[in-house]
Amino acid sequence: MSTKKKPLTQEQLEDARRLKAIYEKKKNELGLSQESVADKMGMGQSGVGALFNGINALNAYNAALLAKILKVSVEEFSPSIAREIYEMYEAVSMQPSLRSEYEYPVFSHVQAGMFSPELRTFTKGDAERWVSTTKKASDSAFWLEVEGNSMTAPTGSKPSFPDGMLILVDPEQAVEPGDFCIARLGGDEFTFKKLIRDSGQVFLQPLNPQYPMIPCNESCSVVGKVIASQWPEETFG
């Protein structure tokens, strides 16, 4: 049993008329044919002809594709579909971001040591400021600013953590050889290095070869794992 196709409205027919007129005007300039338009749209040539001739109605998807191919705005041939696309955009833009952002406090290196799991005498109210990231970490995580160039890798090598870069430290994540970490070397001396194991011994390795490796012995304790890095916003003015 066949069903009779619903005829296009006057508005849809006007859209098709305007679309075809634009195509006829621009096809030579853009080097287009119905066949090439069909290829770009991923449909048959007869389907394109049906859109141009008002046999099949345009929809938002096809209108957007044709606007891109003809290098015009959708509104130039279909004001109603242009409104529809705009309303769809508005609805999407009002939705919460798919990538959540999390804020963590920025501490000084001294505060970072006091924030280690066994001490933790500083509170987040002592933060110098708060910085957001899409990286999810524990509630104990905090930012530190890299000091010096011991973690600046040679040119062309990655990763590299130049002076002034922010690193996100999570005291609740386990640190394994190969991880970057903040370690306490005794007293209030802290260092940012890569933890490595060599010949059964654990070392703190700088990325800058001009600096020596540091043995991680009984006076060395890990404060937290470095899980992310980024430049402060003020770096870019």
Swiss-Prot record:
Residues 19-77 form the HTH cro/C1-type domain. It comes from the Viruses. Residues 30-49 bind DNA. GO terms for molecular function: core promoter sequence-specific DNA binding; identical protein binding. InterPro entries: Cro/C1-type_HTH (IPR001387), Lambda_DNA-bd_dom_sf (IPR010982), LexA-like (IPR039418), LexA/Signal_pep-like_sf (IPR036286), LexA_repressor (IPR050077), Peptidase_S24_S26A/B/C (IPR015927). PROSITE patterns: HTH_CROC1 (PS50943). GO terms for biological process: latency-replication decision; maintenance of viral latency; negative regulation of transcription by competitive promoter binding; positive regulation of viral transcription. Keywords: DNA-binding, Latency-replication decision, Repressor, Transcription, Transcription regulation, Viral latency, Viral latency initiation and maintenance. Acts as a transcriptional repressor that allows virus to establish and maintain latency. Prevents both the viral DNA replication and the exit programs. Clamps the two operator OL (operator left made of OL1, OL2 and OL3 sites) and OR (operator right made of OR1, OR2 and OR3 sites) together by binding to them and arranging the intervening DNA in a loop. This step allows repression of lytic pR and pL promoters by binding to OL1, OL2, OR1 and OR2 simultaneously. PANTHER family: LEXA REPRESSOR, LEXA REPRESSOR-RELATED. Homooctamer. The DNA loop is maintained by octamers of repressor cI. Bacterial cells harboring a lysogenic lambda phage are immune to further infection by lambda. The cI repressor protein inhibits the lytic development of any additional infecting phage particles. The region of the genome that codes for the cI repressor protein is known as the immunity region. This is Repressor protein cI. It comes from Escherichia phage lambda. The gene is cI.
